[in-house]
Amino acid sequence: MPCPAQISDDLEFFVNGRKVTEKNVDPEVTLLAFLRKNLCLTGTKDACGTGGCGACTVMVSQHDPVCKKTRHFSVMACLVPLCSLHGAAVTTVEGVGSIKTRLHPVQERIAKSHGTQCGFCTPGMVMSIYTLLRNHPQPSEEQLMEALGGNLCRCTGYRPILESGRTFCMEPDGCPQKGTGQCCLDQKESDSSGSKSDICTKLFVKDEFQPLDPTQELIFPPELLRMAENPEKQTLTFYGERITWIAPGTLQELLVLKAKYPEAPLISGNTALGPAMKSQGHFYPVLLSPARIPDLRMVTKTSGGLTIGACCSLAQVKDILAESISELPQEKTQTYRALLKHLRSLAGQQIRNMASLGGHVISRHCYSDLNPILSVGNTTLNLLSEEGPRQIPLSGHFLAGLASADLKPEEILGSVYIPHSQKREFVSAFRQAQCHQNALPDVNAGMRVLFREGTDVIEELSIAYGGVGPTTVSAQRSCQQLLGRRWNALMLDEACRLLLDEVSLPGSALGGKVEFRRTLIVSLFFKFYLEVLQELKADQKLPPESTDSQRYPEIADRFLSSLGDFQVTLPRGVQTYQRVDSHQPLQDPVGRPIMHLSGLKHATGEAVFCDDIPRVDKELFMALVTSTRAHARIISIDSSEVLDLPGVVDVITAEDIPGNNGEEDDKLLAVDKVLCVGQVICAVVAETDVQAKRATEKIKITYEDLKPVIFTIEDAIKHNSFLCPEKKLEQGNIEEAFENVDQVAEGTVHVGGQEHFYMETQRVLVIPKTEDKELDMYVSTQDPAHVQKTVSSTLNIPISRITCHVKRVGGGFGGKVGRPAVFGAIAAVGAVKTGHPIRLVLDREDDMLITGGRHPLFAKYKVGFMNSGRIKALDIECYINGGCTLDDSELVTEFLVLKLENAYKIRNLRLRGRACMTNLPSNTAFRGFGFPQGALVTESCITAVAAKCGLPPEKIREKNMYKTVDKTIYKQAFNPDPLIRCWNECLDKSSFHIRRTRVDEFNKKSYWKKRGIAIVPMKFSVGFAATSYHQAAALVHIYTDGSVLVAHGGNELGQGIHTKMLQVASRELKIPLSYLHICETSTTTVPNTIATAASVGADVNGRAVQNACQILLKRLEPVIKKNPEGTWRDWIEAAFEKRISLSATGYFRGYKAFMDWEKGEGDPFPYYVYGAACSEVEIDCLTGAHKKIRTDIVMDACCSLNPAIDIGQIEGAFIQGMGLYTTEELLYSPEGVLYSRSPDKYKIPTVTDVPEQFNVSLLPSSQTPLTLYSSKGLGESGMFLGSSVFFAIVDAVAAARRQRDIAEDFTVKSPATPEWVRMACADRFTDMIPRDDPKTFKPWSIPIA
């Protein structure tokens, strides 16, 4: 088995109300693949393939014949096996509503609330909210947060998405008029300059939204109701090419099958088995599905406990536990409450809907969130087999996999019995992860204690940890030794010693973070100790001598209030901007919060991305083969076995390239040697994507390792391994200045790298034409001209033969500037060689492995200052990890050095930067282009000075900030007035000084939780440091019906550039937006374009569109003058009759920009964007976790072209920057392999990471004569403002260290992960853990910054 001669059963289910009957279903086909390939429903997106991002969310509806109810639940389509859907109804975003038929309120509101940018995540967001509303038409805010916890967005910062969802919620607290135009903020108020300005907070009009009518939703198909109530077949069997899927209808049938196929796993939600089979190479020829067996979903309540069927989903378990908690006295629900607590943060809602309790228990994953609690809660597993039922305890022996305490191969888990807790028993659960939700825990724990009646003497004690071994670890020996001990400080001391001795982690333990995880072992027990102590005190049964306030001052009553986890709340905020002038014509959209013009298409799934383009005739698929060595010579590439595989057409190597194989140091396909793990060596072309991907695993490459192998900046410096010369700027006499200061401080700063994590991975479709060697290319890129040039060079054909089309890009952030040209060129070689269209779509793991990201940075600084805080001298030396090739590293180094001074005027200043060459994938352009790393170094110097002077950091910032018209270190003049205004308004709007006092008061009263607050200024230079990179062109056609087609050189990445260009055209032509359209960006309509980057896309392309429209309007003047009362269409028809050209090319020559590095001076940037941000956080010193309490941002946008889009850019960049500085951590193996290459392992911010109060204000009454309509580009500047969260965390850590009498000047390391925060908050627990000599073990991961 499987046997092709056998005939599969028919699979019957519904999609969007229509019946689907499939014969010969392959069990390896997922719902996502079927929807996209078979049904052409491409609204459901493929972004990660592992169930970690939510882009593929759909709703599944199933009827339960036992309870006679129909369940609606969201799932990740990328994990759902198609064969599991027999009898189910699937609803995709296309089935919810469409522009062509009827928009659903969810779709309308997310678009009109400005909740879409690139739009790639939007269908998944829509489906999560839609499913929530099908179950709860008026949900609570908590339910909304839970529903979106499994959905990722890289663009918006989540706030507008949550705002759209909030419109369905029960009326929240706060101003009921917010967003309607009647808010008290929607009135005239004085700005900081004293003048009157119209301030508005209305980005959308809630009253215009259509109401939600639950009666209009699709009904569950009656045919499926009948199927569920009266199934025609007991057992369903589906035979695939490699796997057979069997779904029995009765428990007895399942037991017979399990006896026949004892090695066959049971597959329920496929949340563990699916990813394991895909990425870890696990393979099972037979899969047994118990989903159709009602017996395995039964729930039984008895006087002693709760029995839950093994096939109940974790979401159902959550509801069952919540119901029991509401029915039972509190003393009986201790275990249930602990389980419910973890179920709220375990994965996302979609995974909880899919994963089963039985699968979670049986998998015994080391990071299981429930097994530690179930283990200490005396849970019993009810096993079933043909031989009869059997019970075993969910004990440490079971978790360790001991044969005597485990399932037999022919047994299945039928149900789980969880007993009630009892009087004098306390159960708690703890978990610490990189972020609050949808993240695997670093360490979790379940703990239970039972006391002798009327005493604090331990009668029973159970402790189990996850994340500290290959499975859940039970600390049985420690617990046994503590029996009979009293619950006091002496017991605590002994318990910590015993636990560290028994639950040991080797220095090379999988997952790394060894010292952090060791600390958590005792820190979490201490939390449990305090919780229980508090409960005992509340019962007033604790003997007074049980505490020792001298030895453990933290257990005094005033510190117990610090306990408890951070609660997740729906963020709130105010967005303020300046209204347009009252005299501006209503049809003129410039300055108004116009919805993204693709917003509705995003929300309905009708927006077409690169891989949504329908399959082309004779199309083939390409998959890449990458290096597994960091530095090696290629001895041979053996593809002989591959060419015989089914569907494989060809293997593409460097020998097949007719032209140039990339640059000398950056080959498209490796020749002779490889320089990093992930370098592309060759590619396989096959008839399907699955065949191509499988075939790559069969290519055998023989290597000979080379020396040296360099991964870290430290090693690169040691080996003098650099990619380009040092970049240096200097002013004043720095040596002399250091001799004349009161104090000198020196330090280092480490800033980790960052993955772009655009939701749409790199992808390209190449279609060769039949004549003249022409190619049509559809690419997800920020720079189609670069793709065009690279392909031209690779194929040795003229550029004019290649047309690149870009409809829209699912996020870029700099990652689609250079790399798409490489993938486009490789695909083009395949297309020319085979003569077939080639589609190349990287999966998430390959994308993250190959493409590189933000440059990690290491910096050394020396700062001289007076006791007043005035900085007299500053010397900063920066090194960035460029990876194995130059790419954009020299430019990043230049921008890094140019922008290092940030907002500060320091008379004696030396700034240096170098790009290191290492054996890692080449790092590349990323939003901010070096500024987010460099400015963090400068602000760290400020923090160090503040600590030495005993002054608040904000005072040091104010004292050293630019105050008057001045010149930068590179001699460019500028006026800092907007900078000062932003700073002062941010101080005012955030009530900074009042809150600073409150933070200090909180910290005096709280020992284990600390708050921090920080405000940072920003001077961000916009644009490229070269005039030629600021040029732009546009083409505008007016058709005889009056409609207008606009083409320009910018690319729509989600930043709303197309929307802004049409706003410009509308103003210039004086016509409504409804007349205007942009089809795509194409190298045919606008040639020689510049990359859409550096925040100038809308600015320079807008000037080109403006120019084209002005030319056309000038031509139309005689016609208009002749018929002033005519309509636009009248004028166009008349112009056509008079043979007036209705097409015009617009052009903008660009801003002058230059930099002379020899002299160290120039005018490299057209203008600056100024801003300031204030953030307040609270940290848990015992775990390193933090929550964002509030953020206030003030940004100088001058006259915003579109306040809704610009505020969205600011918020999105801020959250992305916050991720850089707090949760996004790239981990590499000692062999140079990137571990963190999926959303499970690399944590970008989620909805739970948004500050509870998130306010953004565009600085009113600001002007700049240089730019288009006095607007500014805001795409990148908000990134660095995310550092306000970082420095607030640093402030909180400093408060903790201050209270413990530990030095406040500590090494600054970004990201400020829970690991860094916890270990920086040094205390007796960090002191007691064992530390290994680094020379005695090989670490699991290495730092590369």
UniProtKB/Swiss-Prot annotation:
Residues recorded as binding Mo-molybdopterin, renumbered to this chain, are 117, 155, 812-813, 1094-1097, 1209, 1274
Give residue ranges for domain FAD-binding PCMH-type: 238-423
Could you say which residues bind [2Fe-2S] cluster 2 here?
A: 118, 121, 153, 155
Q: How is the cofactor bound?
A: Binds 2 [2Fe-2S] clusters per subunit. Binds 1 FAD per subunit.
The residues responsible for catalysis, as annotated, are 1276 (proton acceptor)
- A Pfam family (short name) is CO_deh_flav_C
| Cofactor dependency | [2Fe-2S] cluster; FAD; Mo-molybdopterin
Localization (cell):
Cytoplasm
Give the CDD domains listed for this entry.
fer2
Quote the InterPro entries the UniProt record gives.
2Fe-2S-bd, 2Fe-2S-bd_dom_sf, 2Fe-2S_ferredoxin-like_sf, 2Fe-2S_ferredoxin-type, 2Fe2S_fd_BS, Ald_Oxase/Xan_DH_a/b, Ald_Oxase/Xan_DH_a/b_sf, Ald_Oxase/xanthine_DH-like
Q: Where is the 2Fe-2S ferredoxin-type domain?
A: 9-96
Annotated [2Fe-2S] cluster 1 binding sites: 48, 53, 56, 78
Would you name any one GO CC term? cytosol
What GO terms in the biological process aspect are recorded for it? xenobiotic metabolic process
A single GO molecular function term of this UniProt record: FAD binding
Q: Which SMART domains match?
A: Ald_Xan_dh_C, CO_deh_flav_C
Q: Where are the transmembrane segments?
A: none
Entry keywords, A to Z: 2Fe-2S, Cytoplasm, FAD, Flavoprotein, Iron, Iron-sulfur, Metal-binding, Molybdenum, Oxidoreductase
Family recorded in the similarity comment:
Belongs to the xanthine dehydrogenase family.
Function in brief: Oxidase with broad substrate specificity, oxidizing aromatic azaheterocycles, such as phthalazine, as well as aldehydes, such as benzaldehyde and retinal. Cannot use hypoxanthine as substrate.
PANTHER family, sorted: XANTHINE DEHYDROGENASE (PTHR45444:SF3)
Quaternary structure and partners: Homodimer.
Name the chain's protein: Aldehyde oxidase 2
